[in-house]
Amino acid sequence: MAEEYSWDSYLNDRLLATNQVSGAGLASEEDGVVYACVAQGEESDPNFDKWSLFYKEDYDIEVEDENGTKTTKTINEGQTILVVFNEGYAPDGVWLGGTKYQFINIERDLEFEGYNFDVATCAKLKGGLHLVKVPGGNILVVLYDEEKEQDRGNSKIAALTFAKELAESSQ
């Protein structure tokens, strides 16, 4: 009996192994929650948990409006991902693993080697992420880390190459 090839293995072999990304995951298009992920860990940290980069239970943050009034807002990370695709922007950013990523842009029907994808790009200090709607009701989440000599452009190409593979396999 052949060993089952898991999403984690597939993400690792096709994305993480390129060294163009520091992490990759798949989220459901229904709720935006990441259900499979891989990440480059710190070799010096035996307690590294890849999930800490991709998921955190709902939590509250304090936000300040233009008048300086502080209020509490509950963050549901999956919903912050869905807002990007449903609304075309994310005024409160995209949150993943408790980290806020500033929304940069969304490209609808971006053509890549014969396939079209909706692609969103978000940034944080010295890194960022790409969100790509892929066939099968999934959203590909790709992280890049400039401190690991990764950049927005090359990580986006790696994400789109993987998205193309998924599109080809779903035909």
Swiss-Prot record:
UniProt cross-references to InterPro entries, sorted A to Z: PFN, PFN_euk, PFN_sf, Profilin_apicomplexa
Chief location of this protein within or outside the cell: cytoplasm
Compartments where found: Cytoplasm, Cytoskeleton
Gene Ontology terms for molecular function: actin binding; actin monomer binding; phospholipid binding
Motif (Plasmodium-specific profilin mini-domain): 48-54
Region listing for Actin-binding, in residue ranges: 100-112, 152-156
CC per GO annotation: actin cytoskeleton; cytoplasm
Segments for region (Pro-rich sequence-binding): 5-10
Record-annotated site: Interaction with Pro-rich sequence: 35
Family classification: Belongs to the profilin family.
Task of the protein: Essential for the invasive blood stages of the parasite. Binds to proline rich sequences in various regulatory formin-like proteins and also to membrane phospholipids. Binds to actin and affects the structure of the cytoskeleton. Weakly sequesters actin monomers.
Assembly, per entry: Binds actin.
The protein's name in its UniProt record: Profilin
Lineage: Eukaryota, Sar, Alveolata, Apicomplexa, Aconoidasida
